[in-house]
């Protein structure tokens, strides 16, 4: 009952924020927050939107199999955020876009525009469903199975809660709710770390030294080119993951486009980029501490990395407070990710697919429809997924965000004009070719593609657009 009471109290606060920010909200407020968002709130809220429930569960467990090598990817993230801030944001602000995929219509044509928007809908719906599924499974495990509540009911109830507090204010509401949820998530993480350190009988300086001396604190891998943990694979993948999953993601860019000016948007992007490194370092450090904790009580580590955090909390030895903190942290992380995803999906559908940005009736209907489809995706993923959740998201991104990367790079960095009618076929063929290459190379050479599959996918799309016959040239590169 404590967990249920915690969630209800948390949700009441979100509803209060929604009531305040949703007053007299029209479509412009829902889609763009009237372009009046303070940059520092956007920057802080984006931490919670990116560090989802998946991060809360999976990143601490990564140290079991790959030590702290995930930090190599996080270092790449920093350069990726600077690239987005100074290469993509100027284009979006100059064109005064509501959705970033409108750029594809201006530069490449209507088929490319619809293709990009459609791929985003699939990519974001899939990735957000993965993240949200984590919270639903954990709530089932901790509370709801005891009361015999089926998993589908849990999913429907939580999505309905999100719909309630986002249905009026949209992105204007989310700027504030994401700030609140990020505060809750980070406080929960820090307090959990403190509680684990206290249980181990250490001071904070002693714990920091113990983590640094632990064999699982190893970060850099330079000597194994075959390994997925090789530095250059992870670092370069981190750069492109951010460019694609933030810079080409309507969800993330929609918040940035609510800032008053380009300069403020760039400040918020760079600030957030730097903040991502210490945040993930805390999650990985928690993973090392949890392994120390299991060793100290003589308990075997779980078979699956994703269960490291869950087993520590479910065991009960860390106390009821940790259970409450964990619930707050993971619900905050998941809600801040899912609510913005539903808003971005609704925006893209209304503006890009239907071409009716001022139709409030359509927006309200689309918001309900997107929520229903979101529920279906969660249920599908719950019953078919068996891989590590964080890897699942990035694998999905490699196949669905890759064509977006190729289309945007082609439009921004060349003066050529694509054969617009062929773009949908290119966007479908590229992921299929990547899947075939990944399978063949793995079986014949033993080389395993990591997150760099995203770059390969984008490169194939770019080359196909570049070399296939184009219609008559008449458009210049936006980056002239």
Regions found by a protein language model. Give the residues of each.
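Membrane-interface "cap" regions at the ends of multi-pass membrane proteins
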Residues: 1-56, 166-169, 182, 188
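C-terminal membrane-solvent junction of multi-pass transporters and transport-like membrane proteins
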Residues: 26-43, 151, 395-467, 476-480
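Helix-loop-helix junctions that connect adjacent transmembrane helices in secondary transporters/permeases
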Residues: 61, 65-168, 256-395
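Hydrophobic core segments of alpha-helical transmembrane domains in multi-pass membrane transport
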Residues: 6-17, 81-85, 120, 137, ...
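Hydrophobic alpha-helical segments and their helix-loop junctions in multi-pass secondary transporters
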Residues: 17-23, 124-132, 136-153, 164-167, ...
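Small-residue-rich segments of transmembrane alpha-helices in multi-pass membrane proteins
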Residues: 39-46, 107-116, 181-194, 274, ...
């Amino acid at each position: 009952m404590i967990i249920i009471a915690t969630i209800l109290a948390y949700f009441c606060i979100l509803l209060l924020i929604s009531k305040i920010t949703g007053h007299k909200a029209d479509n412009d407020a829902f889609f763009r927050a009237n372009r009046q968002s303070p940059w520092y709130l956007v920057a802080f809220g984006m931490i919670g939107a990116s560090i989802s429930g998946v991060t809360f569960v999976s990143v601490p467990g990564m140290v079991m199999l790959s030590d702290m090598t995930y930090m190599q990817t996080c270092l790449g993230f920093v350069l990726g955020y600077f690239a987005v801030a100074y290469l993509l944001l100027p284009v979006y602000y100059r064109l005064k876009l509501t959705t970033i995929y409108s750029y594809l219509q201006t530069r490449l044509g209507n088929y490319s525009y619809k293709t990009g928007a459609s791929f985003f809908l699939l990519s974001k719906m899939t990735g957000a469903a993965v993240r949200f599924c984590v919270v639903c499974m954990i709530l089932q495990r901790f509370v709801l199975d005891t009361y015999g509540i089926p998993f589908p009911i849990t999913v429907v109830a939580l999505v309905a809660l999100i719909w309630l507090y986002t249905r009026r204010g949209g992105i204007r509401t989310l700027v504030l709710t994401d700030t609140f949820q990020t505060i809750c998530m980070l406080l929960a993480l820090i307090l959990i770390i403190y509680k684990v350190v206290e249980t181990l009988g250490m001071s904070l300086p002693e714990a920091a030294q113990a983590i640094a001396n632990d064999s699982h604190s190893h970060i850099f891998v330079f000597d194994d080119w075959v390994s997925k943990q090789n530095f250059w694979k992870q670092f370069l993948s981190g750069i492109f993951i951010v460019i694609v999953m933030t810079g080409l993601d309507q969800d993330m860019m929609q918040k940035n486009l609510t800032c008053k000016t380009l300069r403020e948007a760039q400040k918020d992007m760079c600030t957030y980029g730097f903040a991502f490194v210490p945040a993930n370092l805390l999650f990985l450090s928690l993973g090392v501490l949890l392994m120390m904790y299991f060793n100290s009580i003589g308990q075997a580590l779980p078979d699956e990395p994703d269960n490291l955090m869950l087993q520590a909390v479910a065991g009960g030895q860390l106390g009821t407070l940790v259970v409450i903190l964990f619930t707050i942290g993971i619900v905050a992380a998941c809600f801040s990710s899912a609510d913005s995803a539903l808003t971005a999906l609704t925006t893209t559908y209304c503006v890009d697919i239907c071409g009716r940005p001022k139709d409030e009736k359509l927006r309200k209907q689309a918001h309900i429809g997107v929520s229903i489809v979101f529920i279906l995706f969660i249920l599908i993923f719950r019953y078919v997924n068996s891989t590590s959740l964080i890897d699942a998201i990035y694998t999905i991104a490699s196949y669905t965000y890759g064509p977006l990367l190729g289309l945007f790079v082609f439009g921004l960095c060349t003066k050529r004009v694509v054969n617009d009618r062929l773009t949908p076929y290119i966007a479908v063929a590229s992921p299929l070719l990547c899947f075939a290459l990944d399978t063949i190379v793995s079986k014949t050479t033993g080389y395993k593609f990591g997150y760099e599959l995203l770059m390969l996918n984008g490169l194939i799309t770019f080359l196909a657009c570049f070399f296939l016959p184009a219609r008559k040239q008449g458009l210049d590169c936006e980056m002239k």
